[in-house]
UniProtKB/Swiss-Prot annotation:
Protein name (database record): DNA ligase 1
Keyword DNA damage attached: yes
Top enzyme category: ligase
Cofactor: Mg(2+); Mn(2+)
Keywords, in A-Z order: DNA damage, DNA repair, DNA replication, Ligase, Magnesium, Manganese, Metal-binding, NAD, Zinc
Length: 719
C-alpha cells in the first residue's frame, strides 16, 4: 500500500530527515507501532502525512546505510503485519507501492515496461478502498473461512463476522473452490447506523469507518449486530480448485473481476468508480482524475486508485518482491485526516435553541483547505470520548464534508490537557439549559435567538433604544408582544404597562425612545437587520452608496460589488440574506421606520453615469452629492479617531464619530497606516498619535475637526 509497510498515506513528497542511527532506530520503532495500531484498530498516533514523511525518511536512510537496516524495519514488511494470525495464506497477501503524482506514475510505468521488455497494452484502474484486506475462501461454492491479511503470510480467522458482511454470500452462483480477496469497510450509512447502535447499547462511537470495520470484524459475542461491506478486488485458486486454477492464471485481471461478480460476490462494478480497462497511460490518468473528483460524493471511503497491468502475461513477467507486486501500484490521493491540537470549544445556539459545541483547532491543511474548526456532536459525545483541551486530535475532512474530530490521540498526551467546561446556562440568552437529552437545548427554544436579535437591533450602535435591555426584551418575547424587532414600533402603552416593573414613567420613556429610533438613518436600520458579514462600518458604506432601502433590496450581486469592501462571495451572500429579510423590512416600512440615509445620493442607473449631473445637488450642504463626494470636506480622505473627544464632539460615541466621517465623505479606519490622511487626536491619544507623527500624517484636535465637518454635525446629533 504505501512505500513503507503499506500504510495509507497522503499525497506528499517530503520526508523526515534522520541524522544518525539513533534517529533511524527511533523512527523504525515509531512507524512500526503506528502501523500496528492502524491495522489492528483503525487508529494511529500518526496521521497519514506524518506516517508517510517518516516512512520516506526511513527508506532514504536505509538507501544510504544498507548495512544498518533493522530487521523490524517496515520497509520489508507487508502492511498490517502487526495483527498476526494462525491461518496460513496459500499465496502471500502483499502490499502495494505508492505513487503520488502524474510524474511519478509515468516513471513507474516506464520502469515496469523496462522490466518486462515491452509496452503494457492494457491497464486495470480501480478505486483503492479504505478498509481492511481479507481473503474469503469458498469450497464447492459454499463459504468456508474469512481471514485477515495479518503479516501477509498468515492471518486471523474472523469467520464469525461473515454473517454481517454485505456482499459476501454464503453460497456462490457456481460450486467452485476459490479464494476471493478484497476489502471490508463501512459505508457512510453503515458507519452512522453502527454508531447509533453502539451508543444505544452504551458503547462509545467508532472514531471513523475504518476503525469501525476493524472493531466489528474482530468483535465476538456482541449483543447487537453491525453491518460492514465487502468489495472484491481479485481471486486466486486454492490447491484443490482443479481446472479453475489454470483458467484464472490465464485471465486478464479485468476478466477475473467480472468472473467474481458473476459468482455473486460484491465488487465496485456497480459504483460510480467502477473498475475500468485502459490502453494508454493518458487514459489511466484521466480515470485517476475522474475518481479523485468523485471522492467526496462516494458513499464509502477511498484513499487512492489502484492501477494494475491487466494482462496475466505482463503480471507473470514482472513478478513480485517480498512486500509488493511489481505490476501494480497505488496512486494516492490527498489525505482527508490530520492530527492537530484542540485549542478551545465554542458553544453556539441554533435557530431552534439547540446548543451545539464547536471545536477550535490549531489550523491545519486538509484536502486542499485550511481547517480551523470542527464539529462536535454533543456534550455526551465529548464525555464519552474523553476529549480534553490541549489534546492532539484526529480531524477528518473530505470535499464539502464539514470537518469533524474523530478521536483524541491518547498516546500523545503530556499531562497538561484540561477538561472541557460545559455551559451552565444558555450562552446566547443566559436562560436555563434542558440537558435531559443528548442534544442540549435552551429552555427558551426558538425564542432564544429572538431575544438576541431584538437586543442587538436595539443596541447603542444600531437603533439605540434606551431602556430596552435584554431583560426587558425577554419580557416582551415571553408576553408574545414581539416576533421580531419591527414589532417594537407597534407596541402600545397599555401593553407595556401590563408587564412587571413597568410603571408609567418607564413606559413613556421607552415609547419615546422607540419613537426616536423610528427616525434613525438607514445605516443604523440596515445594521440592525444583522446581515452576516456587514457590521457597522460596512452598513454605513452600503447605506451611503445606495441611499435608500429600496435600492439596497433591489440591488443584485454585481451592484453590491461596487461598494468598497464587498467582493463576489460576500455580495452573493448579502443578496440571498436580504431575500430572507424581505418580510421584516416590509414590516419596518409599514411601521414608518426611516429608510433613507441623510446626505447620500443614490448611484445613477446603469448606463446613465455619463448623463448624471453632479451639480444638481447642493454640494455644499450635508445633502450634497455623495456619489461623487467631490465637494464633501473629507472626500477621498481616510480618517482615524483616537483619544477622548471634546467640545462639540464630546458626546459622540466612537461609532457616531465614524458615521460623521462617512457623512462628510471620508472613510473611517481603526488603525494608522501610510494610507491614513487625517488623525483626529483627543486627550490620551497614545500610540496612534506617535505612529501618525512618525508617518507624517496630518493631526487635528477635536475642535479643529468639528469646525471642518460642522455642517454635518446636526445630522449626527439627530441620529
Amino acid at each position: 500500500m504505501s512505500v513503507v509497510g503499506g500504510r495509507m498515506v497522503a499525497m506528499t513528497n517530503s520526508a523526515a530527515v534522520l541524522a544518525d542511527a539513533a534517529a533511524y532506530a527511533a523512527a523504525v520503532e515509531e512507524a512500526s507501532l503506528a502501523a500496528a495500531a492502524y491495522y489492528a484498530t483503525g487508529e494511529s498516533a500518526l496521521d497519514d502525512d506524518a506516517y508517510d514523511r517518516l516512512a520516506r525518511g526511513i527508506a532514504a536512510y536505509e538507501a544510504d546505510h544498507p548495512e544498518e537496516v533493522l530487521a523490524d524495519s517496515p520497509t520489508g514488511k507487508v502492511a498490517g503485519g502487526a495483527a498476526v494470525g494462525d491461518v496460513p495464506h496459500t499465496v502471500p497477501m502483499l502490499s502495494l507501492d505508492n505513487v503520488f503524482s502524474a510524474e511519478q506514475f509515468v516513471t513507474w510505468t516506464a520502469s515496469l515496461e523496462r522490466r518486462i521488455g515491452r509496452p503494457v497494452t492494457a491497464w486495470s484502474v480501480e478505486p483503492k478502498l479504505d478498509g481492511l484486506a481479507v481473503a474469503a475462501r469458498y469450497r464447492d461454492g459454499r463459504f468456508e473461512r474469512l481471514i485477515t491479511r495479518g503479516d501477509g503470510t498468515a492471518g486471523e480467522d474472523v469467520s464469525h463476522a461473515a454473517g454481517a458482511v454485505v456482499g459476501l454470500p454464503e453460497r456462490l452462483a457456481e460450486p467452485v473452490t476459490i479464494e476471493v480477496r478484497g476489502e471490508i469497510l463501512m459505508t457512510n450509512e453503515q458507519f452512522a447506523q453502527g454508531n447509533a447502535i453502539r451508543t444505544e447499547h452504551g458503547g462509545a462511537p467508532f472514531a471513523n469507518p475504518r476503525n469501525g470495520a476493524a472493531g466489528t470484524l474482530r468483535a465476538k459475542d456482541r449483543a447487537y449486530r453491525v453491518e460492514t461491506t465487502f468489495f472484491a478486488y481479485g481471486a486466486l485458486p486454492l490447491p484443490d480448485s482443479g481446472e479453475l486454477g489454470e483458467a484464472l492464471a490465464e485471465l486478464p485481471h479485468s476478466e477475473v473481476l467480472a468472473y467474481v461478480a458473476g459468482l455473486g460476490v460484491h465488487t465496485a462494478a456497480g459504483t460510480a468508480v467502477a473498475p475500468l480497462r485502459a490502453t494508454t497511460v493518458e487514459e489511466v490518468q484521466a480515470r485517476v482524475d475522474g475518481i479523485g473528483a468523485l471522492r467526496a460524493a462516494l458513499p464509502f471511503g477511498i484513499d487512492g486508485i489502484v492501477i494494475k497491468a491487466d494482462l496475466a502475461a505482463d503480471q507473470q513477467e514482472a513478478g513480485s518482491g517480498t512486500r509488493a507486486p511489481r505490476w501494480a501500484v497505488a496512486y494516492k490521493l490527498p489525505a482527508v485526516e490530520k492530527i492537530t491540537r484542540l485549542l478551545a470549544v465554542e458553544w453556539n445556539v441554533g435557530r431552534t435553541g439547540i446548543i451545539a459545541p464547536r471545536a477550535v483547532l490549531e489550523p491545519v491543511e486538509i484536502d486542499g483547505s485550511t481547517v480551523g474548526y470542527a464539529t462536535l456532536h454533543n456534550p455526551a459525545d465529548i464525555t464519552r470520548r474523553d476529549l480534553r483541551l490541549g489534546d492532539q486530535v484526529m480531524v477528518y475532512k473530505a470535499g464539502d464534508i464539514i470537518p469533524r474530530i474523530e478521536a483524541p490521540v491518547v498516546h500523545l498526551r503530556t499531562g497538561d490537557e484540561t477538561p472541557i467546561a460545559f455551559p451552565e446556562s444558555c450562552p446566547q440568552c443566559g436562560s436555563e439549559i434542558d440537558a435531559s437529552e443528548q442534544r442540549w437545548r435552551c429552555t427558551r427554544g426558538r425564542d432564544c435567538r429572538l431575544v438576541a436579535s431584538v437586543s442587538y437591533a436595539a443596541g447603542r450602535d444600531q437603533l439605540d433604544i434606551e431602556g430596552l435591555g435584554s431583560t426587558r426584551v425577554v419580557q416582551l418575547v415571553d408576553a408574545g408582544l414581539v416576533a421580531d424587532f419591527a414589532d417594537l414600533f407597534t407596541l402600545r402603552r397599555e401593553q407595556l404597562l401590563a408587564l412587571d416593573r413597568m410603571g408609567e414613567t418607564s413606559t413613556d420613556n421607552l415609547l419615546a425612545a422607540i419613537e426616536t429610533a423610528r427616525t434613525r438613518p438607514l445605516s443604523r436600520v440596515f445594521c440592525a437587520l444583522g446581515v452576516r458579514g456587514t457590521g457597522r462600518s460596512m452598513s454605513r458604506r452600503i447605506a451611503r452608496h445606495f441611499a435608500t432601502m429600496d435600492r439596497i433590496v433591489a440591488a443584485d450581486a454585481e451592484s453590491l460589488q461596487r461598494v468598497d469592501g464587498i467582493g463576489k462571495e460576500k455580495a452573493a451572500a448579502v443578496v440571498a440574506e436580504l431575500v430572507e429579510l424581505a418580510p421584516l423590512i416590509g414590516k419596518l416600512v409599514a411601521a414608518g421606520v426611516s429608510m433613507t440615509e441623510p446626505g447620500a445620493t443614490p448611484p445613477p442607473d446603469p448606463g446613465t453615469e455619463e448623463a448624471a449631473a453632479p451639480a444638481t445637488a447642493d454640494a455644499g450642504a450635508p445633502g450634497g452629492d455623495a456619489a461623487t463626494g467631490s465637494a464633501l470636506p473629507l472626500a477621498g480622505m481616510t480618517v482615524v479617531v483616537t483619544g477622548a473627544m471634546s467640545g462639540a464632539l464630546e458626546k459622540l460615541s466612537r461609532n457616531q464619530m465614524n458615521e460623521l466621517i462617512e457623512r462628510a465623505g471620508g472613510k473611517s479606519s481603526s488603525s494608522v497606516s501610510r494610507r491614513t490622511t487625517l488623525l483626529v487626536a483627543g486627550e490620551k491619544a497614545g500610540s496612534k498619535r506617535a505612529k501618525a507623527e512618525d508617518l507624517g500624517v496630518r493631526i487635528a484636535v477635536p475642535e479643529e475637526f468639528a469646525e471642518l465637518v460642522g455642517a454635518f454635525l446636526t445630522a449626527g446629533e439627530e441620529a
